[in-house]
């Protein structure tokens, strides 16, 4: 008799994806972040669901409903801070996951990679709309500034912004629709993640060497289930330390002031995970140019397979490309720091140089270095 795990229509899908899945024997801890992202997503949906039970999406009551959650709801403060800091963990895992893909050439799985880029955009949109919901000062002004960027689109820009706002400024209609979208998008993300996984399982996982591992596969369970559980425990530990000891470490103090359209905060800035893109946006004096650079900074990921000029898939045996990769990481950290600084003398020029370097490394230096490495192999 066949095991029910292998014969039942529903169990069979789970079995082929998480139990009997053939996995490369040499994938490192950098491959843990896909499962961590799945855990983050489920976690965010659950905490978000409980927050939505007590939240009201009205400009007059939104701020006080969040205060009510923190003060009056049983363990409401834990749920709220788990959700807020869970978003930070989500983005840390996302950035590492994308970085892993760049380093080991995982972008050569075209469908998986492109759906991954769409997922990144969707998660960023969801996080942005979630940041607006508490209706604090930074929520309101962040929403105003970021939605206003669309007015840079020629001809239809102004109409588009007013259509998104549902009026002539960020107001009740905007908050209500942002709550609706923030609630529905995580389920869209879940569906996209399933498709992402579907395409990945068509080809099988990449591995650190970038060489086919078909001749050396091991079952996903128990080897990688156990490894993923260890990774999840580490992530939970970091998240709980953050939530229980310094829940506001990554937040903005301005968001503890109720939204006031008549009073602009001295420094409008988004959450830390958007600062690198915000720095690129600010580094260009022209509004439309800045918006295009902002979109290009993420959309550039779609070009990665076309910019791959190396004969080797992975960077494991390419020291020159490795140097460039870590330069790119350092550059992104610099951009993140600059995005949180005021627009004044040393920061403006540092931001502009870091922005130029970001595009230069990806579009010019990496492909050229790969060609040089190809020629070095002939020696």
UniProtKB/Swiss-Prot annotation:
Protein name, entry field: Cytochrome b
Residues at which a ubiquinone binds: 201
Major subcellular location class: mitochondrion
CDD domains (alphabetical): cytochrome_b_C, Cytochrome_b_N
Note: Heme 1 (or BL or b562) is low-potential and absorbs at about 562 nm, and heme 2 (or BH or b566) is high-potential and absorbs at about 566 nm.
Subcellular localization, as worded in the UniProt entry: Mitochondrion inner membrane
MF GO annotations: metal ion binding; ubiquinol-cytochrome-c reductase activity
Cofactor: binding details: Binds 2 heme b groups non-covalently.
Spans through the membrane: 33-53, 77-98, 113-133, 178-198, 226-246, 288-308, 320-340, 347-367
Species of origin: Sus celebensis (Celebes wild boar)
PROSITE patterns (UniProt xref): CYTB_CTER, CYTB_NTER
Subunit annotation: The cytochrome bc1 complex contains 11 subunits: 3 respiratory subunits (MT-CYB, CYC1 and UQCRFS1), 2 core proteins (UQCRC1 and UQCRC2) and 6 low-molecular weight proteins (UQCRH/QCR6, UQCRB/QCR7, UQCRQ/QCR8, UQCR10/QCR9, UQCR11/QCR10 and a cleavage product of UQCRFS1). This cytochrome bc1 complex then forms a dimer.
Gene: MT-CYB
Residues the entry annotates as binding heme b b566: 97, 196
Domain of life: Eukaryota
A GO term from the CC aspect: mitochondrial inner membrane
Cited function: Component of the ubiquinol-cytochrome c reductase complex (complex III or cytochrome b-c1 complex) that is part of the mitochondrial respiratory chain. The b-c1 complex mediates electron transfer from ubiquinol to cytochrome c. Contributes to the generation of a proton gradient across the mitochondrial membrane that is then used for ATP synthesis.
Gene3D superfamilies cross-referenced by the UniProt entry: Cytochrome Bc1 Complex, Chain C
